[in-house]
Amino acid sequence: MHKQTLSFQAEVAQLLNLVTHSLYSNPDIFLRELISNASDACDKLRFEALNDAALYEGDSELQVRLRYNKTANTLTITDNGIGLSEREAIENLGTIAKSGTRDFMAKLSGDQKNDAQLIGQFGVGFYSGFIVADRITVESRRAGLPATQGVRWSSEGTGEFEVSEMERAERGTSIILHLKDDARDYLNAWKLKGIINKYSDHISLPILMQKEEWKEGENGQPGEMVVTGEWETVNQAAALWTRAKKDITPEQYDEFYKQISYDSQAPLATTHNRVEGGTEYTQLLFIPAKAPMDLFNRDKAAGVKLYVRRVFIMDDAQALMPTYLRFVKGVVDSADLPLNVSRELLQESRAVKAIREGNTRRVLSMIEDLAANDADKFKAFYAEFGAVLKEGLGEDFANRERLAKLLRFASSTTDTVSVGFADYKARMKEGQDAIYYVTADTLAAAKSSPQLEIFRKKGIEVLLMADRVDEWALNYLHEFDGTPLQSVAKGAVDLGKLQDEDEKKAAEEAQTHFKPILDKLKEALKDKAKDVRATTRLVDSPACLVVQDGDMSTQLARMLKQAGQAVPEVKPILEVNAQHPLVKKLEAGEHFDDLAHILFDQALLAEGGMPEDPAAYVKRVNALLV
């Protein structure tokens, strides 16, 4: 019999040591992971058999079996799923994709409860068996291969593993755990059933164990439970989403969510519905409590699994949920899609379009319910996902108004991100005809923005927007409930009825009186500024930068450049406060050019930018200080 002794990939050896010695605070999780893997193997067989029914080999009743042997001190988990070839055993059990391993190691936090969830997330749940076993033997045969091409894989979880050919009549995989002495309590039907009930009850396949019955002891010996030859199903053996809501406990929903999302926390909100009509489907969707580390990766795999008539089709059905709701986890089971549906067909299917729209409406309803009825949960949701929700303004025209009502911001009157557009409108001053906002790289920068000075002086509230996506998103939202949105850093400030006639007259006089200085500033800054003008929006600051209505803001331009995108050159407008001592100093004419460039660069710094030539800026400032 051909036998190979091979070494684990270095990262696997490191992972094994971590798993067996420090990672799991709850060793019961090993059974959840191995049953989940067995279920996945059956899903894969069912999927491949759609095109080749011969893979069933006359046995289409897929199941998972648990058997324990107290004499041999073993626990065996067997499935009749897709199975492994010899090559797959070596590749899947002896190596992990290096990038995945690095990511896994990098994400470990030291919190055992959270780290345990990462095992399944990174596809290494098999190794959790070494928590309770000092040796694992895997016997398998891939569907479609002859009985002579079975494979036996064995390892003690150290540096090496053995692989050999074997004769195996049945298709599928058996994982034999040779239990450690301190893990003998897993040779107990009551213990195993309790774990299955807690972690794997929702698995749609039947999980079978041998029945036990009480046998009285003889000759004064105590009685004991003994295994019969009969098998019984020990789980519900029905996909959770197919059961009636009234029959499912909140704890069962939470455990199902944790299983499919690899999250250690319960979800923030859950919705479970059967949709009937033109398109029939069941949706079981969850909003997580915490955002994943890769939330802002728009190319990440979606979190919704697609089933067709309870047959698993794919893990990351991106067509079922818009990108801005990529944080949603769950399951959609359709009755209308073909079993051999492809990703390409998903993009074109009218049924999928209806499902996507239905999922979007349902998720937005969940969020609206939190906003209306649970302020604490909505605050927690918005802190985690508010930024990506804003992406929907540019992606989902049909739901733009609903999304706008859910957005929250800090403002010049409150530091907490709690002000909605409706709240702002309710507090608008008499005569105010716009919703004013300012964008910046940080909340602190927004609060200290010089463009806010006239608004503070007049007691006009301004929304403070500090998410990277804000500037982009607001290009798609020009008004709220009939009231226009106006950036205080775009265009000439026009407070309309809120500005009295004396102020307007003073501004016109300043523009006329100061025209010679403005013309000189324009000439000195012709390579930097599109225009230079006097302004009434400044009270304490000497100058600020604004852009013309319709132009890209300097903040958005910086963000796009950082993302590696080509950005057209947009020169800002320099607005100066004619009443400020530094600006009046320009009239003396001394060091005019240096002062002009300092004014511009300081205005750029005030809004979070950086002078084009920092060394030249420092040199000019130093020259004026001596």
Swiss-Prot record:
Kindly indicate whether the keyword Nucleus belongs to this entry. Answer: no
Name this protein carries in UniProt: Chaperone protein HtpG
Region spans: B: 344-558
Family the entry assigns: Belongs to the heat shock protein 90 family.
What role is this protein assigned? Answer: Molecular chaperone. Has ATPase activity.
Organism expressing this protein natively: Polaromonas sp. (strain JS666 / ATCC BAA-500)
Q: Region A: what ranges?
A: 1-343
Segments carrying the region annotation (C) are 559-626
Could you tell me the keywords of this UniProt record? ATP-binding, Chaperone, Cytoplasm, Nucleotide-binding, Stress response
